Amino acid sequence: MNMKLTVPFYLHKASAGFPSPATDYIEEDIDLNVHLIKNVPATFIIRVQGKSMNDIGIHDGDLLVVDKSLNPKNFSTVIANVHDELVVKSFVQEKDKKFLTSGSKKFEDRILINEEEDIFIWGVVTYVIHSVY
């Protein structure tokens, strides 16, 4: 993870409304590691398989940047270990109980986080990378 990965970065913003007469040149290069990875030793990338998180913008084949050093907040997207299988879920806390839920109405699961049953948070998703082409 020590390799520097740079890509061209345009300082001009892309308008989501009416077009702006922006210039067509690159201002600088950016290192994606600097922008996507805050804690290198605790960060990994995992590919999504399945459709249970579609409603929150995470799709089959997406890449997730995950930081194992972060503590999840209510409704954070997390990678969890559920009986030795890694899954992507939403973290939900209600009073003194913590649950994992799917981000799709088609999948109505609700898993109680219980380390005694080998269910625990592996890391917090910080970025989602998916193809739009």
List PLM regions with ranges.
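Short, positionally conserved secondary-structure boundary motifs
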Residues: 1-54, 85-86, 93, 97-98, ...
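Short, hydrophobic/aromatic-rich segments at coil-to-beta transitions
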Residues: 43, 73-78
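Hydrophobic beta-strand signal
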Residues: 65-66, 79
